[in-house]
Regions:
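An N-terminal assembly and electron-transfer interface module characteristic of large anaerobic redox
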Residues: 1-264
Length: 264
């Protein structure tokens, strides 16, 4: 076992005939180090490993910051005194820059649910309809209740069955069955409109192409809020720019790390 913390994780040490060793199955960078923890040279290796870890860019943290930051948008022609609740769940972990910017560009206020915690998870457990559904789906129920406590006017959670994809395989266009179907589950299991008198907007979208998305979004916004197609299309363009900025910043950060690895 690894002796460098109280966990004493098991690891595999392969020793070669030339005296070299190779460590595998270690849980962290400390597990790669061999030797007595009391030895000064070993302690120095541990300190170097810790320093290296702290200097390594945390791309997951950066992605989360970029996902939920505010992107630029022009002032809407008409401010709408409606707060749209967006739960930090499922596909929103890919599309949040688009949706927050889209709603703000149309003059709506936005309220996100808090980041997931054990309390949020436990708050929604009573509404989970299946023990076998994935953990991210179980979290949705708690996030809805979190938005209700925040006093939102409406909750928006679209059911998007198909999206365009960077992957050229035709099957990659279809969303995960749970992701695209869970808004329907929520409407029946939690029933926000009946339970909390909060409209739960879960429009069904089939976005095979950009044109489909634009047409369906303009139709939905005109029917639900009386917003003109021209105004919605303008908001879509602004939201697209925000989403592009999100991806561009992630690509730049990833490339910087790869360039550093290649250089070293």
């Amino acid at each position: 076992p690894c002796p460098f913390c109280a966990n004493h994780c098991k690891r595999t040490i392969v020793r070669f005939s030339n005296g070299n060793s190779w460590v595998t199955n270690n849980r962290c960078e400390r597990g790669e180090i061999l030797g007595d923890p009391k030895d000064a040279s070993v302690r120095q290796q541990l300190a170097d490993a810790k320093k290296s870890r702290e200097q390594t860019p945390n791309l997951f943290k950066l992605r989360q910051e970029l996902l939920f930051k505010d992107y630029p948008y022009p002032k809407a022609a008409k401010e709408r005194d409606i707060t749209i609740g967006l739960p930090r769940v499922l596909s929103y972990w890919e599309t949040m820059p688009f949706w927050t910017t889209f709603w703000r560009a149309l003059g709506f206020k936005i309220q996100l649910s808090d980041l997931s915690t054990r309390k949020i998870y436990e708050d929604g457990l009573s509404a989970v309809t299946s023990d076998t559904v994935c953990f991210p789906a179980k979290l949705v129920h708690g996030h809805l209740r979190n938005l209700v406590k925040k006093g939102v006017d409406r909750i928006f959670m679209p059911s998007i069955t198909t999206v365009t994809s960077e992957n050229t395989e035709s099957t990659s266009e279809s969303m995960c069955a749970i992701v695209k179907g869970y808004p329907i589950v929520i409407r029946n299991s939690d029933n926000p409109e009946k339970r909390w008198h909060i409209p739960f907007d879960a429009p069904l979208f089939h976005w095979y192409k950009r044109e489909d998305r634009n047409r369906q979004l303009t139709g939905y916004m005109e029917k639900t809020f009386g917003i003109s197609p021209a105004e919605t299309r303008q908001a879509i363009n602004v939201a697209d720019a925000a989403e592009k900025q999100f991806h561009d910043e992630m690509h730049r950060a990833g490339k910087a790390v790869l360039d550093e690895v290649t250089a070293n």
